[in-house]
Amino acid sequence: SSIGTGYDLAASTFSPDGRIFQVEYAQKAVDNAGTMIAIRGKNGVVVVADKLISSKLYTDNANPRMFNVNDNVGVAVAGNYPDGFALKNYAYGEAMKWLKDYREPMPIQNIANSVAEYIHIHTLGISRPFGAGAFFMSWNKQTGGRLFLVEPSGLNYEYKAWAVGKHRQAAKAEIEKLKIEELDVNQLVKEAARIIMVVRDENKDKNVQIEMGWVGEQTNGKYEEVPSEVVTAAEEWAIAKLDEDDMDD
Amino acid sequence: MFRNQYDGDVTVWSPQGRLHQVEYAVEAMKQGSATVGIKSETHAVIVALKRAQNDLSSHQKKVYEIDTHAGVSIAGLLSDGRILARYLQTECSSWRWDYKQAVPIKKLAESMQLKLQANTQYYGRRPFGVGILIAGYDKDGAHIIQTDPSAEVVSMHGTSIGARSQSARTYLERNVDNFEKSTPEQLIVHALLALRDTLPAEENLNAQNTSIGIVGKDSPFSLLEDAQVAVHLNQVSTHPRTTGGAAAAAAPGGAEPMQM
């Protein structure tokens, strides 16, 4: 491999076979972080993250990973937390500028594009690439649910469902087993909790906590944090379901 | 001269997706003498251990008021910390100018995080080699915010940073359930006991090397005078010392001139 040959020390350097290693390494920061799953269902989008709580001294909901960009669009950041926070702040600022200029909320496609452009500039070599990615999600009657992921490379794709972080492969395999188009948001919340729990590594993933956000018909198209009692109920459902599956085996 | 190829600059990712320069800056914070912050429902307290270069010099200031409703304490490179304290003072006063009211602590924490993050990403800067604790009181109640050079900024019930701070955090984790309903006086005692656990057995807290800052409901931030500090230290001296904890996590090196 080309690691250590000097072609991987700056984002401004191509390796002889045309790769930009610094961007790949930044992606690693996302790959090694806690799992995050986002799923678009029948009438909304749900995002769920597995967060490491390293001490009981943290206050409840310290370091949230999910935020509003505006009333209708939510963002969930994965990877290096401070980098993700800076991305959220940029997205929020762009949405605010749009609102001032056009007197209407910034559409999700424009938000995702503008953040992707911002991230991309950081892959050209003046500074280091962002070690974080961001899901953007929205729902309304006209377009239905929409879900985007912007990666540290600046790539920006729309998804039906996707997973990033440590256990993304296992999580994606689990998502593919579901008929997500047929599930409403309340079912998605449960299944998402189940998937996060089933892909956990029992020996390594300790002191973890689930954080969830949703947008859909039942929230009237507003992006919101999922209330803690709903999260707790989803976790209880998931535990029961996992026990049941164990019995079958 | 470098430990590996990827630690020469903050703008370089290692193949594992880590930022070594930022991690080293966190080490600078860990060399500074400790500071502890805890909160109850109504009050937030920060205490700090000050070092003096020698017997003739004064102790280096570690606690700053940043507004009537908030103060900070510092561990690490104190000159970096002073810059951050000044930055927060400016944030507080410009918010007051814009909104005619005190800045919410959450907003202060967010702007702090963005400032710290920029220093981990852009060429020509280095991360701040300092961690700070913000103690504040606003309409949402009392707050303790912890920051570090990697731009992790987090709200805590209680915490400690700096040399041998693990011992203090152990004390805090054991007693965290009592903080919520504590009186301001009890809160200060808890904080001082935690701070004392960071000291080696032959050293002790005294009015000269200890700073206490407190803020809360209907009481603006105040940095206690030496005489008041002595009163609180008296209450602490009746508690027996837990030995062993501090020695286990001894920090490398002695008192570096810059890091106090």
Curated annotation (Swiss-Prot), chain B:
GO CC, sorted alphabetically, is: cytoplasm; nucleus; proteasome core complex, alpha-subunit complex
The listed locations are: Cytoplasm; Nucleus
Signal sequence residues: none
Q: Tell me the GO BP annotations in alphabetical order.
A: proteasome-mediated ubiquitin-dependent protein catabolic process
Protein keywords: Cytoplasm, Nucleus, Proteasome
For bias type Low complexity, the affected ranges are 244-260
What's this chain's function? The proteasome is a multicatalytic proteinase complex which is characterized by its ability to cleave peptides with Arg, Phe, Tyr, Leu, and Glu adjacent to the leaving group at neutral or slightly basic pH. The proteasome has an ATP-dependent proteolytic activity.
What does the subunit section of this Swiss-Prot or TrEMBL entry state?
A: The 26S proteasome consists of a 20S proteasome core and two 19S regulatory subunits. The 20S proteasome core is composed of 28 subunits that are arranged in four stacked rings, resulting in a barrel-shaped structure. The two end rings are each formed by seven alpha subunits, and the two central rings are each formed by seven beta subunits. The catalytic chamber with the active sites is on the inside of the barrel.
Entry protein name = Proteasome subunit alpha type-1
Natural source organism: Caenorhabditis elegans
Recite the lineage of the species: Eukaryota, Metazoa, Ecdysozoa, Nematoda, Chromadorea
